[in-house]
Amino acid sequence: MKQLCCSCLLWLGLLLAPFSQEQEEVTSPTKLCGRDLLVEVIKLCGQNDWSRFSMEEQSPMTELVPQYTRKVKTFNPHRSSSSWGRFTNPGVSQKKATHTWESQSLPNYQLKKEELLPKTGVHSYHGGKPYVKSVKFQKKNTDKMSTFSGLFWGNHPQRKRRGFADKCCAIGCSKEELAVACLPFVDF
């Protein structure tokens, strides 16, 4: 009886071993540099099974910019005439629609005139004092940006310069981190 129980546990362990290696493979960071990194990203982005990655929950783009969550429709001239509805009369055939383009009127955008510097005559060297305030304001804004960058990256100038590829080469990247490279190709 004891021998039967041990053999069952051994078989169970052998059956679960491939699954545990697969989970470990997903979470463990691997150092990838240059061509190896590119090949791994291509393999990952080319997979049809995205169920292992819950990108909708972890996607920084959908959290920061909510309009990325909507579907984007692309224009394909080989579709039925319903996709041509914006540019043509729906009663016209597709062949005729390609030769006669009846465009609808475009929306009128209200453009805001940009605040330009006041037009004056010749400025002397001392007459440029109003512009000193704008330069100080610009300097203050750039200081705020560098403060934000410092909070995000910390006080490490190397981290600020290090890109995604350098990080994967020096430290290593897991498959979840590599999946970020596929975001431009994912249809949300």
Curated annotation (Swiss-Prot):
The answer to whether keyword RNA-binding applies is: no
The record ties this protein, via SUPFAM superfamilies, to:
Insulin-like (SSF56994)
Specify the domain of life of the species encoding this protein: Eukaryota
Biological process (GO) annotations held by this record are: apoptotic process; ectopic germ cell programmed cell death; fertilization; flagellated sperm motility; male gonad development; negative regulation of apoptotic process; negative regulation of developmental process; negative regulation of reproductive process
Keywords of this entry: Cleavage on pair of basic residues, Disulfide bond, Hormone, Secreted, Signal
Listed GO cellular component terms?
Answer: extracellular region
Q: List cystine links.
A: C33-C169, C45-C182, C168-C173
Instruction: Fetch the SMART domains from UniProt.
Output: IlGF
The reply on keyword Secreted is: yes
Which locations, inside or outside the cell, does it occupy? Secreted
Tissues expressing the protein: Testis and prostate specific.
The propeptide segment or segments lie at 53-158
Where in the sequence is the signal peptide annotated? 1-22
Assigned protein family: Belongs to the insulin family.
What does the record give as the function of this protein? May have a role in sperm development and fertilization.
**Under what name is this protein listed?**
Insulin-like peptide INSL6
